Design a protein with these regions (language model features):
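Beta-rich carbohydrate-recognition and catalytic domains
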Residues: 1-52, 57-107, 120-175, 190-194, ...
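Beta-propeller and closely related beta-sheet repeat lectin domains
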Residues: 48-54, 112-115, 180-183
Length: 234
């Protein structure tokens, strides 16, 4: 199954609609679209910037979906949904950060491409949940966050909808100017415990006019090489 966001923008009014969709395939050549979309619109309190689903199976056997959203007050967040059959979804609410002292309450104007991955800290041996997001609207600093839109990692432990232990600190996933929108791929620990957790991203960003690669190399947008993820020291 391939999960994606269906985006429609009215050419006359400019109004946007976003739906969460799935297609299925047995051979990765022929695809069948699930109609209607599994999530037809965003919940109350959010704009139509509602996209980028990540779906995984939880330890209790149910399925969860993580989405990037924009609140009506024009701040970014991540929403969690739950399902028993991958077709009917119930919104659980926003991912919250009870130990971050409000650091992520108004953190950029949109969170794109959220991914949640569990990694074992190589220094402590503890399993940790790592939230990877691309928060639009973060100001560049003297050193770092100089990408058009940065990609960051927040470390904690997901309990329900709370990412506990995340204290407000975060790290850039990549410090270059041509990295965005990564997707994480991992085998289940039970099926292949030694398999690496891989990350692919865009080598490029949203607008052609802002890309250094246009003038220097005559290209824009491609995938990065795969990267194996590790966590050391939280």
């Amino acid at each position: 199954e391939l999960w994606y966001t269906g985006n429609y923008k009215d050419p006359e009014t400019g109004e946007r609609e976003a739906t969460q969709c799935v297609v299925t395939s047995t051979d990765m050549e022929h695809f069948k679209k699930q109609v209607p979309p599994v999530i037809a619109r965003q919940p109350e309190g959010y704009t139509a910037h509602f996209r980028d689903p990540q779906v995984w199976r939880d330890v209790d056997g149910s399925y969860r979906m993580l989405l990037g959203v924009q609140r009506e007050n024009l701040t970014g967040a991540a929403l969690l949904y739950r399902s028993s059959d991958l077709r009917t979804w119930e919104c659980e609410g926003e991912m919250t950060f009870p130990d971050a002292d409000g650091a992520f309450d108004a953190f950029g104007y949109m969170w794109e491409c959220p991914n949640l991955v569990r990694l074992v800290d190589e220094e402590t041996g503890e399993a940790r949940d790592v939230l990877i997001i691309c928060p639009q609207g973060i100001s560049p600093e003297r050193e770092g966050f100089e990408n058009v839109f940065p990609c960051i990692a927040i470390v904690g432990e997901l309990v329900g909808t709370e990412l506990r232990g995340a204290d407000g600190s975060f790290e850039e996933v990549d410090r270059g100017t041509e990295f965005y929108a990564p997707q994480v791929m991992a085998r289940s620990a039970s099926s292949d415990p030694g398999a690496p957790t891989l990350l692919f991203g865009w080598a490029g960003n949203a607008g052609e006019d802002d890309q250094p690669s246009i003038e220097t190399g005559g290209w824009v947008h491609c995938f990065t090489a795969p990267r194996a993820l590790t966590l050391r020291g939280g």
